[in-house]
Amino acid sequence: MPVGRSLSLDPNLLAQLQSHSPTLWLNPHQGMPLPDFAPTAADLADADARLRRCAGLLAELFAELRPSGGLIASPLQPAEPLKRAARAGHAQAGAWYVKRDDALPVAGSIKARGGFHEVLALAESIAERHGLAGADTDRRALASGAARARFARHTVMVGSTGNLGLSIGMLASALGFRTVVHMSADAKAWKKARLRTRGVEVVEHAGDYAKAVDAGRRQAAGMPCCHFVDDEGSRMLFLGYATAAAELAAQLAQAGRPVDARHPLFVHLPCGVGGAPGGIVYGLKALYGEHVHAFVAEPTASPCVLVQLAGDAAHPRSVYDIGLDNRTEADGLAVAQASPLAAALLRAQAAGAFTVDDRQLFAHLLDARERLGIDLEPSAAAAFGGPAWIAGSDAGRAYLRGRGIDPDAATHVIWATGGSLVPAQEHRRFQAHARAQRQVGGAGA
């Protein structure tokens, strides 16, 4: 049987994916009922409340968070220069913004939202169970000597390609937990080094992301007092990401950008295993319903969410199943199989997915530097082509026409997911590579 035949993928889509051709796929399942296990409005409110009541604790632990009072928040930057630079025939309509999660303090990436939320939920649970905190206790008590001594009896473990490990590792170690991060072969050396300087135990694996996660899961299962942060299925991570929706809504309101039937919101999100974009989309759908149109961006070598959404929902599928190799410079997106939790929710809520090759990643990275003054890591630039796909491709224009959307009235938010902690020499290397490829022919459409 040919590779991919059993996945129930459209033959034309399968051929595009197997050829590594950048592709826009529109989700025919958008609007279907949510699964029974979908988070509730109370779950979303609880997550937001947790991050707010722990803000003082975070500000005490990390000087970088004191200017925000400990709140995990990033700027919304207008991207008019990027819009003006879009080539003829591509997206020129609507208002463009970049959501700067690359600038989130401490962890330097979108993973701070989910990772911090899960660690804080664990710390609260342990502290309350042992009489160290109650419902009304100032959460700065979780940094006390007594709390740290209690946390030191517990291990926090996670598998990661890099950024989630940084997020979990930075906060868990700061609270006194023994912290172990299993990192895949894709993880960058500087991320491992940064964790080790914080006293985090880094376990390196020769395999991919899924193998690192599985190794961590199996080790944690045999250890007492060990909490495994499961990036493939954690509701706490998912809910932490979802809290970004209210933050974005407030920023759009301040910018005078309404979101309603006449003024749709398009959100373009880099996607690895799916938890971060899935959570953000879930939060935005809770606020705006059908007026938000979310597209996830994946490497051509690793479109795990696209493969899962476009195929049979009943069976987990991997990019290896269609003959792809999961090898990309976008280390944070080098994931072969989607989170079952995120995929089930994105199936009902995502408008679609598009793929980007490594040449495009570096072209977008250079555009971010030259047009907006933003230094990103390659995976964080994956979604920069989103507005062009919507207004500059046949499939994108068909999507707009089918919904009666006026492109000029739309707001596009491109999520930048990481880069502020990347060492300067790495940024120079990224940009030199991007300039070299531009000199020999550019990145294509």
UniProtKB/Swiss-Prot annotation:
Catalytic activity: D-serine = pyruvate + NH4(+)
Protein EC: 4.3.1.18
InterPro entries: D_Ser_am_lyase, Ser/Thr_Dehydratase, TrpB-like_PALP, TrpB-like_PALP_sf
N6-(pyridoxal phosphate)lysine: modified positions: K111
GO molecular function: D-serine ammonia-lyase activity; hydro-lyase activity; pyridoxal phosphate binding
Keywords from the named record: Lyase, Pyridoxal phosphate
Transmembrane recorded as keyword: no
GO-annotated biological processes: D-serine catabolic process; isoleucine biosynthetic process
Cofactors demanded by this protein: pyridoxal 5'-phosphate
HAMAP family according to UniProt: D_Ser_dehydrat
Family to which the UniProt record says this protein belongs: Belongs to the serine/threonine dehydratase family. DsdA subfamily.
Protein's name according to its UniProt entry: Probable D-serine dehydratase
Gene name tied to this protein: dsdA
